């Protein structure tokens, strides 16, 4: 009789252990699936993003630069505070410019569709739109130099354009 009791307890422990193991395995697979889907969504968004710098204009003794960008991708772009703007100078130095209305800083001066200010989804950089940003530098760029501005979206797609004064 004692052996039957011990056998039943052992079988119950084996079943409990198997169920516990299976539950842990299923939870792990579920977490992996969620992570995989998130990574795939991010990769898809990145594949569908294409931004191109098309023109630059420098003024105010080299301390202000206007850059026009085109959204040639299939993604509407937002989160401008998570974008990076980096100015690399001809002398080798580089500066990260924050998204700010102060100096140094960069801000959006307009988003346009076919040359007209946007009316559909304001403050969202939609496909086929053009956006103009203004970069304000603490110290203007040196005359007769060629410098490089790099604009990078929140998902890592970037475009570069030279500018000078």
Each model region followed by its residue ranges:
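Asparagine-centered strand-capping/turn motif at beta-strand->loop junctions
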Residues: 68-74
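The feature marks short-to-medium sequence segments in extracytoplasmic or secretory-pathway proteins
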Residues: 76-125
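Terminal connector regions
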Residues: 26, 30-33, 137-165
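Membrane engagement elements in two modes
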Residues: 1-52
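Short strand-edge motifs at loop-to-beta-strand transitions and within beta-strands
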Residues: 129-135
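Structural beta-strand segments of beta-rich domains
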Residues: 63-65
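A short beta-turn/strand-edge loop motif at beta-sheet boundaries
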Residues: 74-79, 141-143
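Short amphipathic beta-strand and strand-loop transition segments with alternating hydrophobic
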Residues: 53-60, 108-111
């Amino acid at each position: 009789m004692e052996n039957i009791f011990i056998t039943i307890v052992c079988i119950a422990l084996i079943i409990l252990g198997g169920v516990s193991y299976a539950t842990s395995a299923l939870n792990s697979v579920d977490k992996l699936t969620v992570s995989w889907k998130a990574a795939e969504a991010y990769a898809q968004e990145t594949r569908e993003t294409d931004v191109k710098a098309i023109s630059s204009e420098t003024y105010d003794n080299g301390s202000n630069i206007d850059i026009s960008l085109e959204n040639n991708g299939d993604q509407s772009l937002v989160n401008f505070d998570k974008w990076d703007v980096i100015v690399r100078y001809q002398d080798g130095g580089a500066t990260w410019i924050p998204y700010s209305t102060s100096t140094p800083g960069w801000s959006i001066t307009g988003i346009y569709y076919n040359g007209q200010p946007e009316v559909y989804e304001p403050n969202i950089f939609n496909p086929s739109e053009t956006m103009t940003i203004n970069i304000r530098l603490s110290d203007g760029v040196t005359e007769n130099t060629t410098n490089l501005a790099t604009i990078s979206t929140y998902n890592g797609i970037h475009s570069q354009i030279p500018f000078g004064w």
